[in-house]
Design a protein with these regions (language model features):
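The serine-hydrolase catalytic nucleophile loop
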Residues: 36-48, 62, 185
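Conserved alpha/beta-hydrolase
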Residues: 50-67
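Alpha/beta-hydrolase active-site loop
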Residues: 42, 71-91
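N-terminal cap/lid segment of alpha/beta-hydrolase-fold proteins
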Residues: 1-23
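Short beta-strand/loop motif that positions the catalytic acidic residue
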Residues: 166-168, 173-175, 179
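Hydrolase active-site cap/lid region
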Residues: 112-153, 211
Length: 233
């Protein structure tokens, strides 16, 4: 199964996935944010799972990745907001319910952007911390082209715990206990400040940094969570 369309918007390469037209207007959509060094195609499996339950999905290459223009820089948050607006345009309503789903760095950005996007819910998989991303930026271990000054400035003062503590929407945190890149303790600390009663943290015993994002069962768990958050279950 292929995307309904692949295109470039404001320098951002994206793939749009649409369910059957008869179901499109009532189900909402998901903007999928990949991790550092990844690309939109890596999350086509989740996009296919989303359209199977009647949700639209939009995956895109963040700057410094894939086919998008320019390095990762201070536009990262505005780019997510723009992609959410584009998905709402495709859904035919500026207030269409949109969920953010991100992995690692994408999980960080999903939580960081949730309020400005007016996200209906967030699914954050092994979400990175601002300090962890800052260290990786400084030591050169991030595997993508970045404007160090601009992206570093975006990260500075952007730790997630105080941000998450202010978010009213349902948030699902998924984290492998054996994650060798982002310690599970980070998600445990975020879980202590979740506000919505339907929010939760699911820990996967063992595993590693990439265990969860492509796991069929956990993708299904994520989509059930999204459907409930959107009032579709």
């Amino acid at each position: 199964m292929r995307p309904a369309r692949t295109d470039v918007h404001d320098g951002l390469a994206y793939a749009l996935w649409l369910p059957e037209p008869a179901r499109r207007a009532v189900r909402g959509g998901v903007v999928v944010l990949h991790g550092a060094g990844s690309c939109k195609e890596s999350h086509y499996d989740f996009a296919r799972a989303a359209i199977a339950v009647g949700l639209a999905a939009l995956t895109f290459d963040q700057r410094g990745h894939g086919q998008s223009a320019g390095p990762m820089d201070g536009r990262a948050i505005d780019d997510v907001i723009e992609m959410a607006s584009l998905l709402r345009l495709e859904l035919g309503a500026p207030d269409a319910p949109v969920v953010l789903r991100g992995s690692s760095m994408g999980g960080y950005l999903a939580l960081r952007c949730a309020e400005r996007v007016d996200a209906a819910a967030v699914v954050a998989i092994c979400p990175a911390s601002a300090s962890g991303l800052r260290r990786a930026l400084n030591d050169g271990s991030l595997r993508f082209d970045a404007d160090h000054a601009a992206f570093g400035a975006l990260l500075d003062g952007g730790e997630l715990q105080p941000i998450v503590a202010q978010l009213p929407m349902a948030i699902l945190l998924l984290h492998a206990q054996g994650d060798e890149q982002v310690p599970v303790q980070h998600s445990r600390e975020l879980a202590t400040v979740l506000r919505a009663p339907t929010s939760r943290l699911i820990e996967l015993p063992g595993g590693h940094h990439r265990s969860i994002q492509h796991d069929d069962e956990l993708q299904a768990v994520s989509l059930r969570f999204v459907e409930k958050a959107l009032g579709l279950r």
